Amino acid sequence: MELRLCLRLHAPPASAPTTHPPPPLSPSPNLALRRLRTGGSCAVAPRRHARKWGSAVCAAKADGAQGEAVKERSVSVVLLSGGQGKRMGASMPKQYLPLLGLPIALHSLKTFCQLKEVKEVVVVCDPDYKDIFEGSIENVQIPIKFALPGKERQDSVYNGLQEIDGDSELVCVHDSARPLVSSEDVKKVLEDAIVHGAAVLGVPVKATIKEADSNSFVVKTLDRKTLWEMQTPQVMRPSLLRDGFELVKRDGLEVTDDVSIVEYLKHSVYITEGSYTNIKVTTPDDLLLAERLMNEK
């Protein structure tokens, strides 16, 4: 399973609260400290993360302050569903395999369609699989659009970005192979993206991570207290993503996730602490785990 890690650093406590609201793209000084991702490492940003080690979920706890409210019908979702899923060893891409009677990709589509903040969903998929999405969710109040997948992930995101409404305040990119993302976590990361311009769901790393040299000898053991595993959704202002794509294309860069595109602009990316249950279904074992987690809900 692809692992995206982020270093986080410690910073001095935040200053005393101010009576004036913060500007949209700057960390708010009147919130408790929260970790902020900046160019591959994390400074400190506002909202405290508290870990619940006794359960599968590592939830973010707010100290009475949250991100700004997200307007109704102001978010465009780009649902990436064009992968081949070769590691699953199935006859079809993994995102279309059944999970409790429903194709994996439709679980997250259903979650997004039920959120009042979402105005549309752009599904990036092979045209042969469009019929899986069309008419799949009852009483859908928002349009479902389609875009063609690209050779690489960043190409698929770019194609999806071209189809979103021009008035959208946020674009929310999600892997359809993550069927267990909760509406609560989606709302949290949307709120944080409104405040900071870009935000991503992530969870603190549990395993010990070692850095190795080219000969596979250990160089050092990294402090797991400073490491995060990235998830999706990854949310940002459309203008940031477009500007990032221009830079990526100009410099011939390759990126492994969506917020990396924004990082190339030297723009801070906020980490919203998510849930360990938001797994990516990549292997047969992942599918079994997803079934068990869904049955426990």
Swiss-Prot record:
<dbReference type="GO" id="GO:0019288">
    <property type="term" value="P:isopentenyl diphosphate biosynthetic process, methylerythritol 4-phosphate pathway"/>
</dbReference>
<dbReference type="InterPro" id="IPR001228">
    <property type="entry name" value="IspD"/>
</dbReference>
<comment type="pathway">
    <text>Isoprenoid biosynthesis; isopentenyl diphosphate biosynthesis via DXP pathway; isopentenyl diphosphate from 1-deoxy-D-xylulose 5-phosphate: step 2/6.</text>
</comment>
<keyword id="KW-0548">Nucleotidyltransferase</keyword>
<keyword id="KW-0809">Transit peptide</keyword>
<keyword id="KW-0150">Chloroplast</keyword>
<dbReference type="Pfam" id="PF01128">
    <property type="entry name" value="IspD"/>
</dbReference>
<comment type="function">
    <text>Enzyme of the plastid non-mevalonate pathway for isoprenoid biosynthesis that catalyzes the formation of 4-diphosphocytidyl-2-C-methyl-D-erythritol from CTP and 2-C-methyl-D-erythritol 4-phosphate (MEP). Is essential for chloroplast development.</text>
</comment>
<comment type="similarity">
    <text>Belongs to the IspD/TarI cytidylyltransferase family. IspD subfamily.</text>
</comment>
<dbReference type="InterPro" id="IPR018294">
    <property type="entry name" value="ISPD_synthase_CS"/>
</dbReference>
<keyword id="KW-0808">Transferase</keyword>
<feature type="site" description="Transition state stabilizer">
    <location>
        <position position="94"/>
    </location>
</feature>
<protein>
    <recommendedName>
        <fullName>2-C-methyl-D-erythritol 4-phosphate cytidylyltransferase, chloroplastic</fullName>
        <ecNumber>2.7.7.60</ecNumber>
    </recommendedName>
</protein>
<dbReference type="GO" id="GO:0050518">
    <property type="term" value="F:2-C-methyl-D-erythritol 4-phosphate cytidylyltransferase activity"/>
</dbReference>
<feature type="transit peptide" description="Chloroplast">
    <location>
        <begin position="1"/>
        <end position="57"/>
    </location>
</feature>
<keyword id="KW-0934">Plastid</keyword>
<feature type="site" description="Transition state stabilizer">
    <location>
        <position position="87"/>
    </location>
</feature>
<dbReference type="InterPro" id="IPR029044">
    <property type="entry name" value="Nucleotide-diphossugar_trans"/>
</dbReference>
<dbReference type="InterPro" id="IPR050088">
    <property type="entry name" value="IspD/TarI_cytidylyltransf_bact"/>
</dbReference>
<feature type="site" description="Positions MEP for the nucleophilic attack">
    <location>
        <position position="224"/>
    </location>
</feature>
<feature type="site" description="Positions MEP for the nucleophilic attack">
    <location>
        <position position="280"/>
    </location>
</feature>
<dbReference type="GO" id="GO:0009570">
    <property type="term" value="C:chloroplast stroma"/>
</dbReference>
<dbReference type="InterPro" id="IPR034683">
    <property type="entry name" value="IspD/TarI"/>
</dbReference>
<keyword id="KW-0414">Isoprene biosynthesis</keyword>
